[in-house]
């Protein structure tokens, strides 16, 4: 090794094994954070969710992407099929299933297949969807005494963190035991952003209620070990989609403005050359 190479190494250090680990001109301004899976969502969840929903509302490409994914993932609905060899039993089960499909929605707005599409859409836009299993009384007259209630992720306060006297801990609204297992969800009775407009606002809507984890299906995509909350699926494309939307708008206005200008060539005598 020459004296020049030794001097360079002393001044700037040895070349890194990986280019991205170096401090060259291309990486000098790249100073990423490295929060844990729980801390990352605590810091960014509300912002990402708000921007994701805003973009889906006003951006045709984002909306089309969500609609296409839901159509491909759910279609007309994911349907179970009995594998029983008893044809009579199979027919009875399928008939019972068809009856329950129409009664599955606790809000009474759609059927079970509609709930699948709605849950998938909520997960894509907001990062997660909470599905509460609501047991019903026999006198309610349902074919199966069970209904499903879909809740947006805002019902589960991500900033709710506490250490309980029982030894359990609450992290991002979810209660864990000392083995790290989910034992309960602490949910708002109504959507916190609806205020007095929410149907449950008069029943302590801004207070949380503890729901056993067995009654909750927490639908989200796990991307990291230890992750407890979901992130919107458009998170990595939000900035570019927003910039593309603004560019497209500006280009449209530019062309519209240019089309409004017209020029005329006049001459004294029709026989004169231009």
Predicted regions and their residues:
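Structured, contiguous alpha/beta core segments that scaffold functional sites
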Residues: 2-63, 67, 110-114, 120-274
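Low-complexity, highly charged intrinsically disordered N-terminal segments
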Residues: 70-105, 116
């Amino acid at each position: 090794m020459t004296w020049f190479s030794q001097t360079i190494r002393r001044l700037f250090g040895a070349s890194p094994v990986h280019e991205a680990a170096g401090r060259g001109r291309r990486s000098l301004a790249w100073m990423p954070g490295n929060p844990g899976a729980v801390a990352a969502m605590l810091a960014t969840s509300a912002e990402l969710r708000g921007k994701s929903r805003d973009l889906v509302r006003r951006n045709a490409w984002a909306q089309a992407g969500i609609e296409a994914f839901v159509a491909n993932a759910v279609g007309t609905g994911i349907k179970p099929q009995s594998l029983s060899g008893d044809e009579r039993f199979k027919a009875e089960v399928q008939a019972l299933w068809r009856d329950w499909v129409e009664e599955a929605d606790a809000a009474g707005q759609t059927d079970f297949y509609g709930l699948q599409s709605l849950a998938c859409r909520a997960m894509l836009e907001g990062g997660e969807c909470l599905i509460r299993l609501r047991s019903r009384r026999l006198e309610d007259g349902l074919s199966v005494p069970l209904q499903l209630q879909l809740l947006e992720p805002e019902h589960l306060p991500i900033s709710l963190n506490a250490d309980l006297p029982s030894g359990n801990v609450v992290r991002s609204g979810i209660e864990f035991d000392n083995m790290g297992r989910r034992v309960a969800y602490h949910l708002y009775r109504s959507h916190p952003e609806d205020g007095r407009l929410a149907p449950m606002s008069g029943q302590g809507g801004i207070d949380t209620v503890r729901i056993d984890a067995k009654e909750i299906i927490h639908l989200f995509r796990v991307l990291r070990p230890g992750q407890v909350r979901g992130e919107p699926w458009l998170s990595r494309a939000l900035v570019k989609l927003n910039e593309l939307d603004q560019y497209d708008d500006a280009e449209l206005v530019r062309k519209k403005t240019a089309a409004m200008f017209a020029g005329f060539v006049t001459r004294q005598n029709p026989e004169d050359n231009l």
